[in-house]
Amino acid sequence: MKYLYIICVLFWNITVILVAAPEKAQVMELLEGRHWSLDAEEFHSLGEGTDRLLIEISADKSLINYLRFRALEALSLFPSENTAVFLESFADNSFAPLARRGFEALRRGFFKTQPKRVKKAAVRLLKHRNAQVRISAARFIRSVDAPRFKHFLKSEKNSWVRKAAQE
């Protein structure tokens, strides 16, 4: 009888683990589709661990970029410390299209709860080597720190970047 009880407990624990953690395939399925839109309820319904899978997908260079872009966008739904650190690092170190989307996900996911953190990342990105990333950061700075935005306009070398940042 004791062994039956132990087997039942083990089976229950394994079942809970399998049900609780989302599979990568489930997350990938939510990222696919021709007319994709971010559905917060769908992603949150996958439960705990979804953010870790989205980070894994975002960082996977073997995947096609549109899946990585969508994974970054979905990460904005999971405002944890782990997500913030990943998005900050991603914005600083990735190639331009991913860096810009990483910053935009950071802005969407953390501006209400950690505005100073987002501003700090944006200030760093004002000096990014890619113009599109600088434009994205400058547009954010324009909305939160007018003097710093004016300083950016004075220091930016490319006139088209200055113009785009003001649009």
Predicted features along the sequence, with ranges:
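Short, flexible helical or helix-coil boundary motifs
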Residues: 11, 34-38, 61
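Short inter-helical turns and helix N-cap capping residues of alpha-solenoid HEAT/ARM repeat scaffolds
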Residues: 62-64, 94-97, 129-130, 157-160
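Classical Sec-dependent N-terminal signal peptides that target proteins to the secretory pathway
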Residues: 2-20
